[in-house]
UniProtKB/Swiss-Prot annotation:
This is Putative manganese efflux pump MntP 1. The keyword Transport applies. It comes from the Bacteria. It is a multi-pass membrane protein. GO terms for cellular component: plasma membrane. Keywords: Cell membrane, Ion transport, Manganese, Membrane, Transmembrane, Transmembrane helix, Transport. The gene is mntP1. The chain crosses the membrane at residues 6-26, 36-56, 64-84, 100-120, 130-150, 158-178.
């Protein structure tokens, strides 16, 4: 696989994480530390799941393909609903500061990387090249998500977005999850 193809593939699968990280970044209760943990979680799981998928891809390819999209879509819809319900509550701590959310969202936005590993990276016969290709995909996801956090800080300054961040982010996540399920 050429570097340009790998870059475009990494960019494409990072867009899910970018959309989710924007929604997280505009949340009022999110701290810089928490947002960076999300960034690295998303990057790590993009790497790990693409590597795992590439490593065992030829065995499970025909059984796993439809499942990741359904699971990822449902998880993102649930997180969107939780965000909206959080908007109605007056509490200090954001749902995103719950440590389990780093894992849940990291895996849910990276499930497509598992599919890419199964379908595309499984043709890489050399384990070192598979590792490096997967690492490259994780690095691209980390960079894209970092840009998403930076962008969300500017978006958060718009007063109407700041006031309704939980609702806006929740609705976007629900729509994104529905897109994953049905389109």
């Amino acid at each position: 696989m050429e570097v340009q193809e790998l870059f475009l593939l990494a960019l494409a699968i990072s867009l899910d994480a970018f959309g989710v990280i924007l929604c997280i970044g505009i949340n009022k209760g999110i701290t810089l530390k928490s947002s960076m943990i999300f960034v690295f979680s998303f990057g790590f799981f993009q790497f790990f799941l693409s590597f795992l998928g590439g490593y065992i891809g030829t065995i499970f390819n025909k059984y796993i393909v439809p499942i990741p999209t359904i699971v990822g879509g449902l998880i993102i819809i649930i997180v969107g609903i939780l965000m909206i319900t959080e908007g109605f509550k007056e509490k200090e701590e954001s749902i995103f500061l719950n440590k389990i959310m780093y894992l849940i969202l990291g895996v849910s936005v990276s499930i497509d990387a598992l599919v890419i590993g199964f379908t595309t990276l499984s043709y890489i016969n050399n384990l070192f090249y598979l590792f490096m290709s997967s690492l490259f995909m994780g690095l691209i996801a980390t960079i894209i998500c970092s840009l998403g956090i930076i962008l969300s800080k500017y978006i958060k300054k718009i007063s109407i977005i700041s006031s309704y961040a939980d609702y806006i982010g929740g609705i976007i996540l629900i729509l994104f999850g529905l897109k994953m399920l049905f389109f």
